[in-house]
Amino acid sequence: MEGAGYRVVFEKGGVYLHTSAKKYQDRDSLIAGVIRVVEKDNDVLLHWAPVEEAGDSTQILFSKKDSSGGDSCASEEEPTFDPGYEPDWAVISTVRPQLCHSEPTRGAEPSCPQGSWAFSVSLGELKSIRRSKPGLSWAYLVLVTQAGGSLPALHFHRGGTRALLRVLSRYLLLASSPQDSRLYLVFPHDSSALSNSFHHLQLFDQDSSNVVSRFLQDPYSTTFSSFSRVTNFFRGALQPQPEGAASDLPPPPDDEPEPGFEVISCVELGPRPTVERGPPVTEEEWARHVGPEGRLQQVPELKNRIFSGGLSPSLRREAWKFLLGYLSWEGTAEEHKAHIRKKTDEYFRMKLQWKSVSPEQERRNSLLHGYRSLIERDVSRTDRTNKFYEGPENPGLGLLNDILLTYCMYHFDLGYVQGMSDLLSPILYVIQNEVDAFWCFCGFMELVQGNFEESQETMKRQLGRLLLLLRVLDPLLCDFLDSQDSGSLCFCFRWLLIWFKREFPFPDVLRLWEVLWTGLPGPNLHLLVACAILDMERDTLMLSGFGSNEILKHINELTMKLSVEDVLTRAEALHRQLTACPELPHNVQEILGLAPPAEPHSPSPTASPLPLSPTRAPPTPPPSTDTAPQPDSSLEILPEEEDEGADS
């Protein structure tokens, strides 16, 4: 956008001011706006102005089921969006910010209703910029001026902090503070002035003019060859930060930051190795590992074979009991029989607990009634095209229902959460025994139960780890996703929640899960499976120039089109490529199980505004006689709702 004497070089919507509703009773607690970088009259200005919310553009909001919160994964506006699939955990709402396009002038009266909040500052007046900690929610930037005052914190609800910092770096030199990696000291892009500033502050041990001239002439090679790592940029050369650089800053707002805003070490990975998968383990091969007393022998070798080739279908019913921890790898045949008898008694005792509840008791137990209603609804829509569950009177549906209700008795704290029926269905299909399937399901839930906890911390942590792996493996793809407001990887949420159950054909899901259950070649292989899928689709995503809506649509249209063997081969190759890197960052080593985890940090006291997990079964009244048509999913599309309070 250009006008008389000014040119807009950067513009980003969805940038909010978070005001105090108690202090400003006549104003919204969230003020939507647009941030711009404007060249005007031989100066460069940073300008923020509020906008008016109007229109009918479509946004995709990932949210907890039956909730109204959070739009931190909102997409860019487009006139229409027809997903052509069933977007689980997606809310479709209609919001379009209407921008106030006016020439930014200092001291001018704003035309927007909330324009008293508008501001414009010359980049030369900036002293420092503080960014928020990495995470899975909104990011903010706090700008401090040379006079010591601070501008209102800018909250980027649709991403864009990195893009803004990249634009600012064209006009300023942003030096990461050695004391605080989230604090950038601002210096002008003038070689002599910058050298004098460095010399005066004694930031460099060596001649500062030489460093500055090399940086300005060739910033790329100077940054990577002289300073080696992005995270350590200027850290080894900078002396302790000048007093007052951080003291002028206000305390950071109580908001979670933008997804993945983390500068990691720049590592050079070696060539990706070639991987060949083996044939499935057969019954004859399995039998060779069974000793005289029925005890399995050479278990590590057997697990490695399962990892590299999977299991033949006829062997799964027996082998899955070991992979899921129902039977011990070290136990004898007699010990296994005794264990099964004990677990059978335990199962039916728990089943009797809910079976013996009378209708009158259930009416006074809203929690149990809520679980039962949710399970009945989900079971009727789980894998209904599979013959084992086909038809309303199919006994397989009854077994699904009974096992899930019994699990509520087994795990009172967790109960039933939508998505669990998707995890149980393949297990029951393979095991074909109610008791054995229940205990195998419990073993699987031990691995993934954190995905369904109401705190959502496990899902946030997994998405953060996935982003970290992807940034090491393919930083260009990460930058592209960031530029399209998809850097939080919300479109991968369903993959991780139910371990790709909806992405592959049913037989391929069985193969994928048994490989993942081996725990080889290390923990979090499912994250590398996600990286492998994105790696396979990177050219399509990047060369097609997809926006956030198209990325979401394309990812969901991959359902049932992926080859599990190709994905597993690529995931293993990615693992070998990472483990062969001698300078792999420690946090990546932790994810791959190559290094012990660091001391756990205290969880953030502020809950994320983005509900990332499906809804727990709520206490519900008895169902009415009128029922709406149900989609073919145990995780349904939320009805269209007003966006009221989504950003609060």
From Swiss-Prot:
Comp. bias intervals (Acidic residues): 638-648
Composition skew (Low complexity), residue ranges: 625-634
Region of interest (Required for interaction with OPTN), ranges: 218-309
PROSITE patterns: TBC_RABGAP
Natural source organism: Homo sapiens
InterPro entries to which the protein is assigned, alphabetical: Rab-GAP-TBC_dom, Rab-GAP_TBC_sf, SGSM1/2_RBD
Keyword set, alphabetical order: Autophagy, Cytoplasm, Cytoplasmic vesicle, Endosome, GTPase activation, Phosphoprotein, Protein transport, Transport
Site for Glutamine finger, residues: 418
Site (Arginine finger): 377
GO BP terms: autophagy; protein transport; retrograde transport, endosome to Golgi
Record annotation: effect of changing residue 381 to A: Strongly decreased inhibition of Rab8-mediated transferrin receptor (TfR) endocytic trafficking; enhanced Rab8 localization on ERC tubules and Rab8 interaction with TfR; impaired inhibitory effect on autophagy
Annotated protein name in UniProt: TBC1 domain family member 17
Region of interest: Disordered: 240-259, 594-648
Subcellular location per the Swiss-Prot or TrEMBL entry: Cytoplasmic vesicle, Autophagosome; Cytoplasm; Recycling endosome
Function statement: Probable RAB GTPase-activating protein that inhibits RAB8A/B function. Reduces Rab8 recruitment to tubules emanating from the endocytic recycling compartment (ERC) and inhibits Rab8-mediated endocytic trafficking, such as that of transferrin receptor (TfR). Involved in regulation of autophagy.
Record domain Rab-GAP TBC: where: 310-520
SUPFAM superfamilies named among the record's database cross-references: Ypt/Rab-GAP domain of gyp1p
Subunit: Interacts with OPTN; this interaction mediates TBC1D17 transient association with Rab8.
The record's note on its domains: The arginine and glutamine fingers are critical for the GTPase-activating mechanism, they pull out Rab's 'switch 2' glutamine and insert in Rab's active site.
Positions bearing Phosphothreonine: 606, 615
Ranges of biased composition (kind: Pro residues): 597-624
Gene Ontology MF term list: GTPase activator activity
Modified sites of kind Phosphoserine: 602, 604, 608
